[in-house]
UniProtKB/Swiss-Prot annotation:
Keywords: Cell inner membrane, Cell membrane, Magnesium, Membrane, Transferase, Transmembrane, Transmembrane helix, Ubiquinone biosynthesis. GO terms for biological process: ubiquinone biosynthetic process. It comes from Pseudomonas syringae pv. syringae (strain B728a). Catalyzes the prenylation of para-hydroxybenzoate (PHB) with an all-trans polyprenyl group. Mediates the second step in the final reaction sequence of ubiquinone-8 (UQ-8) biosynthesis, which is the condensation of the polyisoprenoid side chain with PHB, generating the first membrane-bound Q intermediate 3-octaprenyl-4-hydroxybenzoate. The keyword Cell membrane applies. It is found in: Cell inner membrane. It catalyses: all-trans-octaprenyl diphosphate + 4-hydroxybenzoate = 4-hydroxy-3-(all-trans-octaprenyl)benzoate + diphosphate. This is 4-hydroxybenzoate octaprenyltransferase. Pfam families: UbiA.
């Protein structure tokens, strides 16, 4: 229904559809992968009953900043995307959207996100500048380092400390366990994503953890996912979470095991499905957190 509604805009205004594709509004998987860990932090910070204002600010913020991240990513990659099978039809490559239009849209999305942050507090506002720096720098890292996924993980996790300061005005040390867990998880699932493009990336010199890890990719991903679960277990102990939370972690572990098995042949489609599948792991952990507070 959601996608059908968006596609109806294509019939009414093909120009609007170009910008929808640029912001990936038609592909909500990135929103989910950013939203679930942010909500982990929001719910834990609020001890199971976060304020409606905090929830609304962070849900809308996730939507806007994910869109902004997609725009700046395509701007940075506009000269190489045409050489990659998966990205050769993106709006900036095809010329349907100009680089100037993309930068203006990025500025608008970031500006709207900042307006949301203004409804929080000084600590959260200051933290937001770090998030912007990470989001804007990630797309350019592929040119200089084999670890752009680490920068992406740092950016995707930045909403977690912000959630604590927004909800409580404080940033407990244990919140960084959640941050590290999400960073490790993000590096893992985005390596699956990078495996889809690895053959093309090797030809054009684009760097990624998929290129760096080589044949050890799946084992390293599973290790990263295991370390992420370990950090979440430590965080659960620090925040005094109970059985429901750990059941959520067990469900996530099952997701990770399935991904490892399904990518044994390293086929492009299988790697992409494994990337998408991480949404369910994030949701399982979130539901575990919600249930744990609900049954108290």
């Amino acid at each position: 229904m959601y996608l059908s509604l968006l596609k109806s805009l294509n019939r009414l205004s093909p120009r609007a559809w170009d910008f929808i594709q640029l912001t990936r509004i038609d592909k909500p998987i990135g929103v989910y992968l950013l939203l679930w860990p942010t909500l982990w932090a929001v719910w834990i910070a609020g001890k199971g009953a976060p304020s409606l204002q905090t929830v609304c600010i962070f849900v809308l913020g996730v939507f806007l900043m994910r869109a902004a991240g997609c725009v700046i990513n395509d701007f940075a990659d506009r000269k190489v995307d045409g050489h990659v099978k998966r990205t050769e039809q993106r709006p900036l490559v095809s010329g349907k959207v100009s680089p100037r239009e993309a930068l203006v849209l990025f500025a608008v999305l970031v500006g709207l996100s900042f307006v949301l942050v203004l409804f929080t507090n000084a600590a959260t506002i200051w933290l937001s500048f770090g998030g912007l720096a990470l989001a804007a720098s990630y797309p350019f890292m592929k040119r200089y380092t084999y670890y752009p996924q680490v920068v992406l993980g740092a950016a995707f996790s930045w909403g977690m400390p912000m959630a604590f300061t927004a909800e409580t005005g404080e940033l407990p040390a244990a919140a960084w366990l959640l941050y590290i867990a999400n960073l490790l998880w993000t590096v893992g699932y985005d390596t699956y994503y990078a495996m889809v493009d690895r053959d093309d990336d090797l030809k054009i010199g684009v760097k990624s953890t998929a290129v760096l890890f080589g044949d050890a990719d799946r084992v390293i991903i599973l290790t990263l996912q295991g370390l992420a679960l370990g950090c979440l277990m430590l965080a659960g102990a620090r925040f005094e979470l109970g059985a429901c939370f750990y059941i959520g972690l067990l469900a996530a572990a099952g997701c990770f095991a399935w991904e490892f098995w399904s990518t044994r042949e390293r086929e492009r489609d299988a790697c992409f499905k494994a990337f998408l599948h991480n949404h369910w792991a994030g949701l399982a952990i979130f539901l575990g957190i919600v249930a744990d507070y609900a049954v108290r």
